[in-house]
């Protein structure tokens, strides 16, 4: 009895369990039939038995998938054939059929459903299977299939037009208010204006949806614009006169960039945390700009918020670092770190990629060379800006470097000119092969060939290109709206350097050289300064320091980041141009620049009586005052010296010959009267320094180390010297000297000499003459120095 009850109860429980089982097992088959019907036109006809419907008789038996009429491997072959017939694309139905056939005999139904759902999800994310409707998303920025850009699901065109309306209203209304001193409350002031489509008493009508526009610290930003010399009318003309241009290359955070038509300002979307941090930064930012407006930090001119459809889009207006009318051959985002600081493959494939620190080390292993004054000005500016950022606890900023290669640009223009000339020649040759014209010109192809050769030869000259004069005129006449906005203005105040007439050099950049001696123009600035060292960044640094080297990651404490940033910029990125300074002579006295640049004043007239006897002249044609420093010698002086030396060569040679004859005659006369001695002639070279501009005390201090035999320099009589000086950059090195023979005079001699003023004086003295002849050798000449030491 009990056994019967158990037998009667078992089917009841079994039926309850089997009522739900057929539906679950038949669900994959139903999905398969639906998918096959959808793609019926794309599939090869395959005979598949219809799905069996569940019946009460079948419920009692264990449910198994219906056997397929396909032989093992037949479905796989059909799958390949269908895939090849459709260009090798794996359709959804074929994938589903293959998966069901394999999993029906090997996996349970629950695992089959999970695998099919995963496949559907993966295929739905594939743009090739969804008809290309997949959107590219980076942050809040999305790009649809047709190229339409949205930010927070708001069209970019609506954002652009709305902020132009808001800026036009706020700046215009603020211009009517009188100017006053900036107060602390002005940094926290906010103003909100509603813009209905039909307009209001203070806002114009527009074709956009209803939105609100918020302005942060309008009076404070007006002060910043005045500090950089931006008039309200000019700011409105730049922002609102024409539609803004959207940059196609967004930042790493997915921000949207708008550029004004005149290339002066750029508007960037920022996050809420960055907007709040900039508000807190405004008082310190104001203090820094008041003390030093020449900085590489971003120059902010406005902070706004666009509110539409319960979403806020925050934007900041600032100066544009990279002019769009100048081609940037390379762009670098440098932080001084090395961990994952290499551009990705997707970034490298862009038309204008932005490289990073490791890429810069590969492209410029020895860095970029700057002149000494430019290097010092740049590094002092970076040091000061890093100190300001460190005081605000800011890190993770970077230096944006845009490089314009002048030599490469000239080469590209030359190639373009040659291609244009060849295309013109080909067109004329093809026209000549056609029907003859009324006035045929047989010399036209030859003339075009000559023109092509002329273009090639003209283009080979450095600094010449098509439109160079026009571009140069634009660069020289174009006055930037924002003061101190260019890279050169940001680091130095010397902006009065004229451009060369034969060079097409863009204005505003910093001149530099590569290790291959290529001419470069740099456009630099510090960006991304709205990242503070908050708790999130501290945790990121701690986590990365555990896994990797903490000194190489980008995120670190502000003090260490500033030091690492300065070291990388000053030692790896930028370097001084290697120079070879001239070695000075042993003189301790430095000749003033005024004396060096007035050689005409060094030739006072000499008046000597005709019958007077002159004593031997102490000629110092080899030793001189120290050569001036490299910076003291201007190009005009060197050019003037080189040209005047050719004109004075004949006259100087004649005068030197006359002087030599006179000196020999005088010395022979002295030897006849007072004693015997060997006559010594003085040789003057064209390239020599003379110490005629110095006094006797200077000579005593300069040459006090020279040897003398029984002489006292303090008892020397006034001597006459040849007043000659020709500037040169040749380094003179003393090799040695030959000491002469002491010749005592037989008696006293009367010496008639003339001073500088022309007065004659006769002095009787007993002299012991010691002649020292020093041979001075230089790379390009050899001169002789004669010194006469007098006894006490």
From Swiss-Prot:
Basic and acidic residues bias: where? 1-21
Q: What class of enzyme is it?
A: transferase
Q: Which GO terms describe its cellular component?
A: apical plasma membrane; cell cortex; chromosome; male germline ring canal; motile cilium; nucleus; plasma membrane
What's its catalytic activity? a 1,2-diacyl-sn-glycero-3-phospho-(1D-myo-inositol 4-phosphate) + ATP = a 1,2-diacyl-sn-glycero-3-phospho-(1D-myo-inositol-4,5-bisphosphate) + ADP + H(+)
Region of interest called Disordered, as start-end residue ranges on this chain: 1-74, 105-139, 423-446, 577-612, 640-714
A Gene Ontology molecular function term for this protein is: 1-phosphatidylinositol-4-phosphate 5-kinase activity
The primary site where this protein sits is cytoplasm
Q: Return the Low complexity bias intervals.
A: 642-658
Q: Which InterPro entries match?
A: PInositol-4-P-4/5-kinase_C_sf, PInositol-4-P-4/5-kinase_core, PInositol-4-P-5-kinase_N, PInositol-4/5-P-5/4-kinase
Q: Write out the GO biological process terms.
A: apical constriction; basement membrane organization; cortical actin cytoskeleton organization; dorsal appendage formation; endosome organization; epithelial to mesenchymal transition; establishment or maintenance of cell polarity regulating cell shape; follicle cell of egg chamber development
Known EC number? 2.7.1.68
Phenotype upon loss of function: Late embryonic lethal with no gross morphological defects.
Q: Where is the composition biased (Polar residues)?
A: 52-62, 105-131, 678-702
Per UniProt, subunit arrangement is: Interacts with ash2 (via B30.2/SPRY domain); the interaction is direct and seems to be specific for ash2 isoform B.
> What does this protein do, in the record's words?
Catalyzes the phosphorylation of phosphatidylinositol 4-phosphate (PtdIns[4]P) to form phosphatidylinositol 4,5-bisphosphate (PtdIns[4,5]P(2)), a lipid second messenger that regulates several cellular processes such as signal transduction, vesicle trafficking, actin cytoskeleton dynamics, cell adhesion, and cell motility. PtdIns[4,5]P(2) can directly act as a second messenger or can be utilized as a precursor to generate other second messengers: inositol 1,4,5-trisphosphate (IP3), diacylglycerol (DAG) or phosphatidylinositol-3,4,5-trisphosphate (PtdIns[3,4,5]P(3)).
The name this protein carries in UniProt is: Phosphatidylinositol 4-phosphate 5-kinase type-1 sktl
Q: Which organism is it from?
A: Drosophila melanogaster (Fruit fly)
Encoding gene, per UniProt annotation: sktl
